[in-house]
Every structure is written in structure tokens, then in C-alpha cells.
């Protein structure tokens, strides 16, 4: 169980060849008693992107601020604050910050526990 504020959770710089200019926070996870889902907040800087990948579990994405694209199985869709995506099992996907103003692309991403990459806990 948890009741908290996102500002009190550590922002982790995700270092990988698959990511560029991405930071994340784990908001809800098994560490606070969630045994089914993990909720993460990602911040993607200008020119940054998440990994271009697929996996055997669904993703739920909600964009909080910024501009970018979500690519789903090779098709790009524009995203902005209020945009959301359901990414089914096996769908190749990537989020990219396309802004030229320096604004962050911030989004919430919810996955099953087995889909969490294990940072920031």
C-alpha cells in the first residue's frame, strides 16, 4: 500500500544503448505491495527515445506533457499531453521526444510485474 507524491521519488538516469536521454521513477511496484502491476513515470529529453522493442506482455501509456511519437509495429502516431496508447503483447514499440523547444516528453507506463526492468527501487 502507498500514498505518496511523485516529487519525493528518486529520478533514475537509464543508461543503455537502447535508450537515449531517458530518466524514470518507479511509482508503484512490489516494493509497496503491488503484486500484479508496476507504474512508472518516464521523462525523455529532447532528441531522446525509449528502446525500440517488443515483449510478451501489454503496456499502457499515458502522456502527461511534451510532444513526440509512439511507433507501433512500424507506424508512427503523434502524441502530446492527454494522448494514451494500449500496446498489446508482441507489438514492437518506441516513444520518441520530437520537440525542438527542449521540453521533456513525460509519460506514465504501466506493465505487469514481470515486465518491469527493475530500476529505482
Where are the model-predicted features located?
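Conserved short histidine dyad/triad with adjacent acidic residue
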Residues: 25, 40-55, 89
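Histidine-centered metal-chelating micro-motifs
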Residues: 49-51, 69, 85, 89-95
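Short histidine-centered beta-strand/loop micro-motifs
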Residues: 30, 49-55, 96-98, 120
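Ligand-binding loop in jelly-roll beta-barrel domains
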Residues: 33, 89-116
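Glycine-centered loop/turn positions within well-structured domains
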Residues: 58, 77, 93
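Short, conserved beta-strand element in jelly-roll/cupin
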Residues: 43-45, 54-70, 110-112
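A short, N-terminal "cap"/entry segment at the start of jelly-roll beta-barrel domains
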Residues: 1-36, 120-121
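Short acidic-glycine-tyrosine-enriched beta hairpin
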Residues: 75-89
